[in-house]
């Protein structure tokens, strides 16, 4: 029998990670799974509230599951990523990254640009890139298979919007994924 009480999907640069938490309130068991792999297992934890901290993804992003009693034997489980609630983390992340999803040569691809470092990730792999200044901004070039790709960065001309990033694959613009 499983004591699965919470499941979260966390989008990081190297992909979307599934975090699952088992809490056996009668057995004292706590188990954390990341992408189906057991990360933490504790038995006989008779203090039923508390927290479990672990790391997720290629960048070893810190994650914490908080276990709080809400009434009697009812519990609330919240996930923090890098010290922020999952909701707040995802809101901040949407400001610091751009994400595109496309199908190329029969394969689903997820391309992520980290705006602060200009690092580009494709399906969990950090890509080798080459930056180039062009008349109206910059282009960050990389390859996926034998396909030429680049992310064009141009000013929106509006302070509130900032820089607009566009993914071009084989001279075709790919729409950005909105969260």
Swiss-Prot record:
It is found in: Cytoplasm. It comes from Mus musculus. One of its GO terms (cellular component) is cytoplasm. The gene is Faim. Belongs to the FAIM1 family. Its main location: cytoplasm. Plays a role as an inducible effector molecule that mediates Fas resistance produced by surface Ig engagement in B cells. Coiled coil: none annotated. This is Fas apoptotic inhibitory molecule 1. Pfam families: FAIM1. Widely expressed, with the highest levels in brain, thymus, kidney, and spleen. The keyword Membrane does not apply. GO terms for biological process: apoptotic process; negative regulation of extrinsic apoptotic signaling pathway via death domain receptors; positive regulation of canonical NF-kappaB signal transduction; positive regulation of neurogenesis. Keywords: Acetylation, Apoptosis, Cytoplasm. The modification N-acetylthreonine is found at residue 2.
């Amino acid at each position: 029998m499983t004591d699965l009480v919470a499941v979260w999907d966390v989008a990081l640069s190297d992909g979307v990670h599934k975090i699952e938490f088992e809490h056996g309130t009668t057995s004292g068991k706590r188990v954390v799974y990341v992408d189906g792999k057991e990360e933490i297992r504790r038995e006989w934890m008779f203090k039923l509230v508390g927290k479990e901290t672990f790391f997720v993804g290629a960048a070893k992003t810190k994650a914490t599951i908080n276990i709080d009693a809400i009434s009697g034997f009812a519990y609330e489980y919240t996930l923090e990523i890098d010290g922020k609630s999952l909701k707040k983390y995802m809101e901040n992340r949407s400001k610091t990254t751009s994400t595109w999803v496309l199908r190329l040569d029969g394969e689903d691809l997820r391309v992520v640009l980290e705006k602060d470092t200009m690092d580009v990730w494709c399906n969990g792999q950090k890509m080798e890139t080459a930056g180039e200044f062009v008349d109206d901004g910059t282009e960050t070039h990389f390859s996926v298979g034998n396909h030429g790709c680049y992310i064009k960065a141009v000013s929106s001309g509006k302070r509130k919007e900032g820089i607009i990033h566009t993914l071009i694959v084989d001279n075709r613009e790919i729409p950005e994924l909105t969260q």
